[in-house]
Regions:
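Hydrophobic transmembrane alpha-helices
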Residues: 20-74, 80-81
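C-terminal ends of transmembrane helices
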Residues: 12, 60, 98-106, 203-210
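Structural signature of hydrophobic alpha-helical transmembrane segments
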Residues: 38-52, 80-94, 187-195
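Short, highly charged, low-complexity non-transmembrane loops/tails of multi-pass membrane proteins
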Residues: 270-327
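Short, Lys/Arg-rich, polar N-terminal cytosolic tail immediately upstream
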Residues: 1-18
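Membrane-interface helix-loop-helix junctions at boundaries between adjacent transmembrane segments
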Residues: 59, 72-146
Length: 336
């Protein structure tokens, strides 16, 4: 525990010293991962999958705000879908425009959550998203997570049904779009995932805002239990085939809870053993306050002392007194 807190303080100090360089570097890394995930799943436009294009685009996104990065990633998805099927690209473009006009225009800071969901699914840790969102954000971010799940399921559907999508033949564009929409939105796993994630976010947010000891850890544990119970309940009680193995569900949820626990230690580390209950009042109210001190550990300072060996030899070496040479004596003259 103390080692983690000490590492946190060192990390904070390092970040404050090099924030100017680390912020764009973090954006470049996240954008590069997002590009790789998109190209791996729906890389139908060869030009956009070139390493040079991916690298240059990632570096450019390092100096752009998050809202513009989300727009660029959305256009990349639309470009890949256009190379596969024009109607599918139109559907994706309409969905993205609705997302921005209805939500991300007013809450641009939540835009990064939209593409964190597909990245988490690609890394096989999807259930860490609702727990971390419940810890760090508010229930309003449920909309961002829902859009992220929509983008993930859309790319997953296109990746698994590319041959079927190309074989769709109809005289009317609207009929072809209707066929594609029915194929995308008839997957019940999509709706179950959005509902379970929304419930987990609300539960985690409510519990971590309570004034009880270890509220964040309780929120993480209960949120993980709700996540497992939600997917298993949908499959057992509602008889909905979610195509999720119980073993992988439990393992991935445990990993998500561990990641959230580390996040808790790094962000919200308090000492409940020194909790104080205070009471004071003014002319209108009586206040009952629970004060929990934070755990602050100063990062150990490493001092390097340089020792000059030559100087040390000169200091330690003592000069020996000169001895009179043998056979020579001083003559002393005496005057009577």
């Amino acid at each position: 525990m103390m080692m983690i807190l000490s590492f946190k303080e060192r990390l904070k100090q390092f970040y404050s010293n090099f924030e100017f360089y680390l912020k764009p570097l973090f954006k470049i890394l996240c954008t590069f991962i997002a590009f790789c995930v998109i190209n791996h799943k729906i890389g139908y436009m060869t030009m956009l999958t070139q390493p040079t294009v991916v690298g240059v685009a990632s570096i450019m996104c390092g100096v752009l705000p998050c809202s513009l990065i989300v727009v660029i990633l959305s256009l990349i998805i639309v470009g890949h879908l256009y190379a596969l099927n024009m109607e599918l690209a139109i559907i994706a473009l309409i969905l993205f425009v609705l997302m921005y006009l209805l939500y991300f225009k007013f809450t641009p800071k939540d835009g990064f959550v939209l593409f964190m969901v597909p990245i988490a699914f690609a890394l096989n840790i999807p259930y860490v998203v609702p727990i971390l969102v419940g810890l760090a954000l508010t229930p309003v971010s449920i909309v961002s997570v829902a859009f992220g799940v929509l983008v993930e399921k859309m790319m997953d559907y296109v990746s698994n049904n590319a041959v079927t999508i190309n074989s769709v033949s109809s005289d009317s564009i609207l009929k072809r779009m209707n066929i594609l929409l029915n194929g995308m939105f008839t997957d019940k796993t999509f709706y179950i995932t959005m509902i379970v994630f929304a419930v987990v976010i609300i539960v985690v947010y409510i519990l971590r805002t309570r004034s009880v000891d270890h509220a964040w850890m309780v929120a993480i544990i209960v949120g993980a239990i709700c996540n497992v119970a939600g997917f298993i309940g949908a499959e057992v009680v509602l008889s909905i085939n979610t195509d999720i193995e119980t073993s992988s569900l439990v393992i991935q949820t445990v990993i998500a809870a561990l990641i959230a626990a580390v996040f808790n230690i790094c962000v919200f580390s308090v000492d409940y053993s020194r909790t104080e209950h205070l009471q004071f009042e003014d002319d209108e109210y009586v206040y009952y306050v629970k004060a929990v001190p934070k755990i602050n550990i100063a990062a150990p300072e490493v001092s390097v002392k340089r020792i000059n060996t030559r100087r040390m030899k000169n200091v330690t070496k003592k000069k020996e007194p000169a001895r009179p040479q043998a056979g020579k004596r001083k003559r002393v003259s005496r005057e009577d």
